[in-house]
Regions:
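A short helix->beta-strand "capping" segment at the edge of beta-propeller domains
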Residues: 118-140
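Intrinsically disordered, Ser/Thr/Pro/Gly-rich linkers and terminal tails that flank
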Residues: 101-104, 132, 163-201
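A flexible loop/linker signature enriched in serine peptidases of the S9 family
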Residues: 1-6, 12-13, 20-27, 34, ...
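Blade-edge beta-strand/turn elements of extracellular beta-propeller
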Residues: 8-21, 127-134, 173-178
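Residue-level marker for the onset of beta-strands and adjacent loop->beta junctions
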Residues: 4, 130, 140-142, 164
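Short, acidic, Ser/Thr-enriched surface-loop or helix-capping motifs
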Residues: 10-11, 32, 147, 170
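Conserved beta-propeller blade repeats
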Residues: 1-2, 21-41, 47-48, 138-156, ...
């Protein structure tokens, strides 16, 4: 019996969507890139458990946003150019009428309500065309976390009897062993993405 990953509308107004539909086991999903993508592990490419002897997995990234997908595939020079262009466009954008802005600010000060969060619009129709394999090698995987910028993946993998902590630099296409025998457990990144916290028994 394979496991899939589902997207559930908490309001109950939309049907449940099977995001993976791979026919293999897809587990351990996490939101990534401010909700514009998700990472998860799957045994679709590794050593498969057809005979119930266990399986090897990889981590994948599925995009629900075209801009995020295209940005992920940019190199350093392209990213720098895109950021410069975006900053210039923002600077040159026409400003709103000062009086209208002043009235809005005065109105905002009268209420303690938090500003409404703009809901994400997920492009689910094209999700299967925007899947990226993140890990360079299949293995018996533990948990994994993707940095906020989407440039590095930290993951646990077992090769020689215990979980090791690895880093996959997705910009430089380099894999690096960080710590041997790090132990298994759930991992979390801080907001800046420069510290990993592991909950391990």
């Amino acid at each position: 019996n394979n496991k899939d990953i589902a997207l559930i509308d908490v309001t109950g107004k939309q049907p449940i969507v099977n995001l993976t539909e791979s026919g293999y086991t897809d587990v351990n999903p996490r939101w990534a890139l401010d909700g514009k993508a998700m990472i998860w592990s799957s045994d679709r490419a590794g050593y498969r458990s057809h005979g119930s002897w266990g399986a090897e997995r990889d981590y994948y990234l599925m995009f629900f946003d075209l801009d995020a997908y295209e940005r992920f595939h940019m190199n350093k020079e392209e990213l720098a150019l895109a950021d410069t262009t975006k900053a210039a466009d923002k600077k040159d954008a026409p400003t709103k009428d000062k009086k209208a802005k002043s009235k809005k600010n005065a109105k905002d000060k009268k209420t303690d309500e938090a500003p409404a969060t703009k809901p994400l619009v997920l492009d689910l129709d094209n999700r299967f065309d925007r899947i990226v394999r993140l890990t360079a090698h299949s293995a018996r995987m533990g948990d994994a976390v993707l940095t906020p910028k989407g440039d590095k993946l930290f993951y646990q993998a077992t090769f020689e009897g215990g979980n090791d902590l690895w880093e996959q630099d997705l910009r430089e296409r380099k894999t690096r062993l960080l710590t041997k025998q790090s132990g298994g457990g759930e991992m979390f990144l801080n907001k800046a993405g420069d510290n990993i916290y592991m909950v391990s028994n």
